[in-house]
Amino acid sequence: MIKKLTHATIWFLYSNYINYKLYLVLIIYQKS
């Protein structure tokens, strides 16, 4: 149970990190 919860948390943080990077790329692209 704990391992599943940890895996889900890591996946959640990783997906948020990817979304954040994509968001920054879009902002930089629009400014230029």
Swiss-Prot record:
Single GO cellular component term: phycobilisome
Keyword annotations from UniProtKB, A to Z: Antenna complex, Phycobilisome
Protein name per its UniProtKB record: Uncharacterized protein in cpcG3 3'region
Native source species: Mastigocladus laminosus
